Every structure is written in structure tokens, then in C-alpha cells.
Amino acid sequence: MRECISIHVGQAGVQMGNAVWELYCLEHGIQPDAKMPSDKTVGVSDDSFNTFFSETGAGKHVPRAVFVDLEPSVVDEVRSGVYRQLFHPEQLITGKEDAANNYARGHYTIGKEIVDIVLDRIRKLADQCTGLQGFLIFHSFGGGTGSGFTSLLMERLSVDYGKKSKLEFAVYPAPQVATAVVEPYNSILTTHTTLEHSDCAFMVDNEAIYDICRRNLDIERPSYTNLNRLIGQIVSSITASLRFDGALNVDLTEFQTNLVPYPRIHFPLVTYAPVISAEKAYHEQLSVAEITNACFEPANQMVKCDPRHGKYMACCLLYRGDVVPKDVNAAIANIKTKRTIQFVDWCPTGFKVGINYQPPTVVPGADLAKVSRAVCMLSNTTAIAEAWARLDHKFDLMYAKRAFVHWYVGEGMEEGEFTEAREDLAALEKDYEEVGMDSADGEDIEGGDEY
């Protein structure tokens, strides 16, 4: 059995966790009290959804997940919410005082008091697995817990479970909608620390998702619930192949093999289609070709950047629902003829395709329409360097004046860590730039007219 353990850190991680597990439960027909009427083989754990749920003798299905926050209020909502019976009380771990948007508190002072409890709990979950394949870590870059505690936890997971994959779902600080002034600091510190410990990180930019909700779902003022439900759909599409039997089952290591050409370049861009409200879906026919084309629209991306300015290194299309390979091949051939997509010259224009026959599920009463087919595209493109450049620029503006730095130093950090982290991100931008250069550029500049 190839189990995955989900770890939800900080407010963003926990709230994404709520949306994701709510959707998983609906998809698998698991009730809020963890019972699963459709599961006839009680106690037999060979069903594919057992990668994400463990089955108890009493026929309950418990998520293989841990929720961690350094302050209790957000996790308390889970403890008293609709799904309170779904989780084991020990899976919900909280501290007493929060990280106050401060990476140093999450990573050093407050985080280190709770990290052993969390690792113990993860160890217990790992012991219940027959063949653990890895961890999915949900967090934000901007918060103190999401940035500081996550990076501490990832370091420790690398020590304890060296060879296991670690995939992140990270909320990237939105350019316009910032919840904290120091988000650029936290983001850059956490990226620097986790860069070598993470195998693949799917970034989600709040602002991009705001725009999608506003534009495609006609929600004037999207709430976090709207955002998280949309993120839930995306996570569900990415993990569907692990939870259902499909024509092409992608496991965690397969993601890395196909999307990550170099260890540091592990930030795929996620695009999901169709995001459409019920009123519109009624009047539109969403064919395979249409949803595939929608994936190449910058407007449907989860991070604000323009792939038309970058080059693709790899591309995965994960379809679910009523989709046949013939339609997919036609859609891809059509896209290749348009040639709006530029691949790097050292990578053949390969699209990896996964088809899963389980149709997309929607949360009842939510904003998304029920559709018969959907697609999630994961592409590794050099355009995502734009996102890093934006963040680095903000970091520089503040750090030039050493604004807010004393809060970090006061919690036991050294100023050198800031410079070190910033240099690492400069190197990351450079890496992206080099990867996008044509391999012929280096040797011979004149022969530029072989088009």
C-alpha cells in the first residue's frame, strides 16, 4: 500500500486542510462521523482510498493527517466543527502562543517546543502504514507558523525519513492582498531553509485565486472559504491518481520524475479548468479540447506570472471524469500546432497525461458547478521566476532599511541568515534563467538563424 501522510501547518494549512478533507470525504462517500456505508470490506485495507485514510476495526475511516498550529483558535474550529469526529484528537496539535507572523518564533523559540510532539504523532501515523510513500505539507509562506515551523519540521522529517518524498502545497503571498507586512521576509527565509528538503512545491497565489473567483465564479468579494474550496479541487485533482484507480496512476515519486529536471527547480505551475459557476455551466459545453486550451490561459493559473514569457521544461495533464485518450491526443496536437508554447530546446515537447475515470465532485452549496470532466495541468516553466523576482524585490526594499529585522534578531536569529537566504534566492532566479537559455547559446552566438 502506498500511503501518504498530510501535514497541515498554521492557519492557512489548517484551513486548506478543512476544505481538502471535506472534499475527499465527499468523493469517497465517507460521512462526517468517519463511517463509510459503501465500504463492504471492513478492515480490509487494500482499497485505493486507504492511501489517505486508515481504517479502524470499528469500520471508521480516519484521515492520515496531522493539523498543527502554534495557537489554538483555528484548530479549535476543527475540534468543534462538522468533521470533529473524523479526526483522532491527538491528530490536532496546538501550542499556546502564536508565532506572531515571525519566522524566527515559528522556527526557533516557539516552534522547537512543539516539534517533538508533532514528530511523535507523525511517527505513529507512519507506523500504521505498510509502505509510506511520502508527505504532503500544506502551509503558507507569509505566516510565522507556516514559514518558520514548516521549515523546522521539514528539516526534521529529512533526518527521520530521509528517502521519503515531501511535496508542499504552499500559499504564496499575494501582491495586493497581504495579511502581514513581513511576508517577504518570512517567504524568503522559509524558501531558503526548505529548498533542499522539499522535492516538489505547488505554489498557490492568493491573488490569482481571488481573480479566478471574481472572474469565473462571479463572487464579488471572495472569502477564504471560496479560495480554499477552489484549492481543494486542485489538490484533489493532483491526488486523485493516488486515491482512485485510473488509466495512469501517478505516485508521488512519479510527479518528481516528470516535473523536476533539476533538484532546485521544483516549483511547478498549477492550472485548473473548468472553474465555472453553475449558471454558466448550464449554457456551455466543456469539451476536452476546450478545457485543455483553458489550461494554457494565464488567467487560469494559480500563480500570477506569464508562461508566454517563459519556456516550458515539463508538462503534466491530469484529466478526470469522462475523458478518452483519443480526445486528449487531438487536443494536445491542436495546441502543439498553435506553437504559442515554447519548450526549452533540451527537452522534447513531451506532455505526460494521466486520466482518471472518477468524475470531479463538488461540495454541495459551494460556488463551483458540477461538471463531467476537469483537467489539472502541472507545468514546470521558467516563468515562475517572475514570482520569485517580485518577492525578492519587496524583501530588498525592506531589508535595505533593516525594517522589522529586530523582531527576528530578538528571537535568536542572526542578521547573516537574512543575507544568506537572499543570496540563495538570487541563485534560484539565476538557475531559472540558465535553464531557460538555449543550450546552443553558450557555444556559438552567430548561428541564430536555424529557425
Swiss-Prot record:
Sites where the protein binds GTP: 11, 71, 140, 144-145, 179, 206, 228
Alphabetized Pfam families for the sequence: Tubulin, Tubulin_C
Modifications made to the protein after synthesis: Undergoes a tyrosination/detyrosination cycle, the cyclic removal and re-addition of a C-terminal tyrosine residue by the enzymes tubulin tyrosine carboxypeptidase (TTCP) and tubulin tyrosine ligase (TTL), respectively. Acetylation of alpha chains at Lys-40 stabilizes microtubules and affects affinity and processivity of microtubule motors. This modification has a role in multiple cellular functions, ranging from cell motility, cell cycle progression or cell differentiation to intracellular trafficking and signaling.
Chain positions with N6-acetyllysine modification: 40
Keywords, sorted A to Z: Acetylation, Cytoplasm, Cytoskeleton, GTP-binding, Hydrolase, Magnesium, Metal-binding, Microtubule, Nucleotide-binding
Cofactor(s) this protein requires: Mg(2+)
GO cellular component: cytoplasm; microtubule
GO biological process: microtubule-based process
Compartment(s) of residence: Cytoplasm, Cytoskeleton
EC number: 3.6.5.-
Main location: cytoplasm
Catalytic activity: GTP + H2O = GDP + phosphate + H(+)
Active site: 254
Positions bearing the site annotation: Involved in polymerization: 451
Binding-site residues for Mg(2+), renumbered to this chain: 71
GO MF entry, a single one: metal ion binding
Segments forming a coiled coil: none
Catalytic EC class: hydrolase
Role summary: Tubulin is the major constituent of microtubules, a cylinder consisting of laterally associated linear protofilaments composed of alpha- and beta-tubulin heterodimers. Microtubules grow by the addition of GTP-tubulin dimers to the microtubule end, where a stabilizing cap forms. Below the cap, tubulin dimers are in GDP-bound state, owing to GTPase activity of alpha-tubulin.
Assembly: Dimer of alpha and beta chains. A typical microtubule is a hollow water-filled tube with an outer diameter of 25 nm and an inner diameter of 15 nM. Alpha-beta heterodimers associate head-to-tail to form protofilaments running lengthwise along the microtubule wall with the beta-tubulin subunit facing the microtubule plus end conferring a structural polarity. Microtubules usually have 13 protofilaments but different protofilament numbers can be found in some organisms and specialized cells.
UniProt family annotation: Belongs to the tubulin family.
Protein name per the record: Tubulin alpha-1 chain
